[in-house]
A protein has these predicted regions:
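Generic, ordered loop/turn and secondary-structure boundary motif
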Residues: 6, 20-21, 25, 58, ...
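Structural signal for hydrophobic packing residues in well-ordered secondary-structure cores
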Residues: 36, 40, 74, 78, ...
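Cleft-lining beta-strand/loop regions that shape enzyme active-site pockets
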Residues: 4-78, 85, 235, 242-305
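Catalytic cores of large soluble enzymes that bind and process phosphate-bearing ligands
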Residues: 24, 62, 132, 147, ...
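Charged, alpha-helix-enriched surfaces in structured cytosolic catalytic cores
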Residues: 27, 65, 95, 102, ...
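Intrinsically disordered, low-complexity segments enriched in small/flexible residues
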Residues: 1-4, 156-244, 248-253, 265-266
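Conserved catalytic cores of soluble enzyme domains
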Residues: 53-172, 288-291, 295-305
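Residue-level recognition of alpha-helix initiation/capping sites
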Residues: 30, 91-92, 131-132, 228, ...
């Protein structure tokens, strides 16, 4: 159905595990599809809250077909440039996670939520050697599959913030640069001074600029393939009332992905980082908002990848 979150209209989908374990039969698949189509017609964001468990198929092949049906509905929503946000509670497994939920533009999860196609109990029953297999939201964010982990009592506040960013009601107009600005003399520094400044460990990094230039910054994580490269920061924020997508290269002394052969740590960009930036660009196109990038990097990470 439809509702308001802080005066912002949205279509709401709620999957409750108390009803047949949150599985997706013909009726559930039809209702989800109709809700996604309603969001497309009304041109308002769609928010889905999921609590499902198990891989059971209530009606055999007809139930299985709902995965494709709902996935096509999400694709149609994306083609119309309508945001789709999903909240994963504990647990979120089975058909729903493996179909439309994992195709969302922004995925938020509760802490320690059990996530995956099969439940951890089913996996350990099939393979006794995988009892310690990480199957939680913390693992999924590390491997780039979800955007944010938020406590339940703070989800509404974050949703309201995100919806405000995705409801751009103000557009910054282009202006002509004045002649007095074009004639301004900027301080000259020779190349040696510039190189020394760039290597100064105490100079401002990307996060400093994000905190001091933009407001309501909502960071998104992961490349949706394999990892979340921390050398690339992506997210949505506001500047002068205009929502923008931000891609910032965080040159730092730490690189969680790897260490150099000398033992020092640096912030080279991995293939995951490039995929993460590409995803942010695609989201900017989807949400119809400008893109702002901060370039500050020692270069790409050299390796087999």
């Amino acid at each position: 159905g439809t509702c308001k979150i802080d005066d912002k209209d949205v279509v709401m989908i709620v999957i409750d595990s108390s009803f047949l374990g949150g599985s997706m039969g013909v009726v559930v698949g039809e209702k989800v599809t109709l809700a996604l189509e309603l969001a497309k017609r009304k041109k308002i964001p769609c928010i889905c809250t999921v609590s499902s468990s198990g891989t059971r198929l209530q009606e055999g092949i007809f139930s299985l077909l709902q995965m494709a049906k709902t996935s096509f509905a999400v694709r149609s929503l994306k083609d119309a440039n309508i945001p789709f946000i999903t909240i994963l509670s504990n647990p979120t497994t089975g058909q729903i996670f493996s179909s439309f939920a994992s195709l969302s533009d922004i995925i938020i999860s509760e802490p320690n939520a059990q996530i995956g196609f099969s439940s951890l109990g089913e996996i350990t029953e099939f393979d006794k050697n995988k009892k310690d297999l990480p199957h939680t939201s913390e693992t999924f964010i590390q491997f780039g599959q979800i955007d944010k982990i938020i406590n339940r009592d703070k989800i509404k506040t974050n949703l309201s913030l995100l919806l405000d960013l995705l409801y751009p009601n103000h557009k910054v107009n282009s202006i002509k640069i004045g002649k007095e600005y074009l004639k301004k003399n900027f301080p000259y520094k020779n190349p040696e001074e510039i190189i020394k400044l760039s290597r100064n460990k105490n100079r401002p990094k990307a996060r400093y600029y994000l905190e001091n230039i933009f407001t309501n910054f909502f960071e998104i994580h992961g490349d949706r393939v394999s990892y979340d490269d921390t050398s690339i920061i992506t997210g949505i924020g506001k500047i002068s009332g205009q929502s923008v997508m931000i891609i910032a290269q965080q040159k730092s002394e730490k690189n969680i992905r790897r260490k150099s052969s000398s033992g020092s740590q640096s912030g080279e960009i991995t293939p995951s980082g490039f995929r993460k930036a590409t995803r942010a660009i695609n989201l900017a196109e989807l949400f119809k908002i400008p893109l702002v990038s901060f370039v500050d990097t020692p270069g790409p990470a050299l390796g087999m990848e």
